[in-house]
Amino acid sequence: MPAAPECRLSNHGRIMKCVTFLLLLPETLKKLKRASKHPGRLSVCYNILTLSLKKRMAAELYPVSDHATLQKSGAVMLSLPEKKRNVEPVSQTTASIATTPTTEQNINNNNVEIPSWHSAHPTLRERNALMFNNEQMADVHFIVGPPGESQRVPAHKYVLAVGSSVFCAMFYGDLAEGDSDIHIPDVEPAAFLILLKYMYSDEIELAPDTVLATLYAAKKYLVSALARACVGFLETSLEARNACVLLSQSRLFEEPELTQRCWEVIDAQAELALRSEGFSEIDLPTLESILHRETLNVKESVVFQAVLGWADAECRRQGLSPTSQNQRSVLGKALHLVRLPSMTLQEFADGAAQVDILTLEETHSIFLWYTAATKPSLGFPVNAREGLTAQRCHRFQSSAYRSNQWRYRGRCDSIQFAVDKRVFIAGLGLYGSSGGKAEYSVRIELKRQGVLLAQNLTKFVSDGSSSTFPVWFEHPVQVEQDAFYTVSAVLDGSELSYFGQEGMTEVQCGKVTFQFQCSSDSTNGTGVQGGQIPELIFYA
């Protein structure tokens, strides 16, 4: 009885497998013999057949001319439709993913269609970064920001859990959240996106207007590397105008190094810091800590005016009319941290005595403290603040004068310097007349890459000695490390003066190292080896 078509097909399949095995057997035995000659190698007992080789072998075993021949022989040709995966385009903020599929063969010679972005981004980091803020494969969403200003952000639990122990506990811990939408009202959307971008790609993009919010987000989710980057960014952008605000934030975030850097700026540039807009935005505990500060380099009259400005702003924040009574109320004990008796009598009479924030009894007692032999007890500290002690970097080993003494002729004496630690340049020490007492008019300048940072036009009197005489800038100027700055002095007065000799290219002053080099601005002969500008006066 003839076999059914299905049986014939089955027999053909078995025959084909047997023939294939017999064809491959001699070649396999040869390989085994060759492998036995090399005992260090593992014997290979399999062969991977490529698709083209399979087709050629089948053609040799079963030569078929066309489709009609197959039909006559009774064989069934199965045509399996190729499965195609429809990939929807992804809406994405930061990157677009090309989703046109490409076909490749895997190790089993199966055709596999893959999205083109896999091959276009060969590294794991690139592919991971592509998923940032991307709906594709997202398994969680965050509603970030306060109501009315929130933003929906897609994310991937695994990526976040790997980068943050907080997210790991949130998604995979014992108290894992099952909600697909997680609300985070206390984080700004821009800061949250910066956090996520770092977690997906190791890229950090910080800006002055978002760095504090980013630091908060990094602290909240314990992403320490990003938090350190934020602190470093804040330290490099720290200035007198933002020092008080950053001090307040550093105390909130418990960042002691940043707090110390803020204090350095506030102490050295106290007047600029207290008169900045940011000072009125600080909280009361930070205000009190500033008023407790012994090292503020500022007049007490400036401190008092700054306190009044803060009280006015605080009244408005609390919805109060800024009357003297309300100002006194919001200040509380902070008012009694102002050292009113340390002002001069003239400063007190022209300022604090004419402001109603003090009671009549307080004003009367302070006037008596100034004038009476028996001092009344006061509710205010009476000792002036110590301030900072200025340091001097002297760059010459000796000074001299001869018949051809140094001459001031209205020309520019200039020198360049750099430091290895941030300092605040307060002024210059200059040589005076070698012929007795003399008065000089002087203009001093501080520049960086040709940009004027500070200048002052003033006078000083020399006594005929070889001592240096200080000339101050209006405010100390912050000087960053590892950058060259130029200081200049133009003097008019007695022509003959002392001059420095045996100049040093490097000088160690406490914990700060100064380097000096000649300046092209110098037209009066001053250089590294000799000339004028013997001293830099600074705070560190």
Swiss-Prot record:
Q: Which GO terms describe its biological process?
A: neurogenesis; regulation of neurogenesis
Task: Name all BTB domain ranges.
Answer: 138-208
Q: What is its main location?
A: cytoplasm
The alphabetized UniProt keywords are: Cytoplasm, Developmental protein, Differentiation, Neurogenesis, Nucleus, Ubl conjugation pathway
> Has keyword Nucleus?
yes
Q: Which Gene3D superfamilies match?
A: 1.25.40.420, PHR domain, Potassium Channel Kv1.1, Chain A
Tissue/organ expression: Expressed in the developing central nervous system.
- Highest rank taxon of the organism: Eukaryota
Role, per record: Adapter protein for the cul3 E3 ubiquitin-protein ligase complex. Promotes the export of zbtb16/plzf from the nucleus to the cytoplasm and targets zbtb16/plzf for ubiquitination and degradation. Up-regulates neurog1 expression and antagonizes zbtb16/plzf, to promote neurogenesis.
- Please tell me whether the keyword Cytoplasm is annotated for this protein: yes
InterPro entries documented for this protein:
BACK, BTB/POZ_dom, BTB_POZ_BTBD6, Btbd6a-like_BACK, PHR, PHR_sf, SKP1/BTB/POZ_sf
PANTHER family with a match to the protein in the record: BTB/POZ DOMAIN-CONTAINING, BTB_POZ DOMAIN-CONTAINING PROTEIN 6
Give the subcellular location: Cytoplasm; Nucleus
Q: Which GO terms describe its cellular component?
A: cytosol; nucleus
The identity of this protein, by name, is BTB/POZ domain-containing protein 6-A
Subunit description: Interacts with cul3. Interacts (via BTB domain) with zbtb16/plzf.
Provide the phenotype resulting from gene inactivation: Morpholino knockdown of both isoform 1 and isoform 2 leads to a major decrease in the expression of neurog1 and downstream markers of neuronal differentiation. Knockdown of either isoform alone leads to a mild decrease in the expression of late markers of neurogenesis, but has no detectable effect on neurog1 expression.
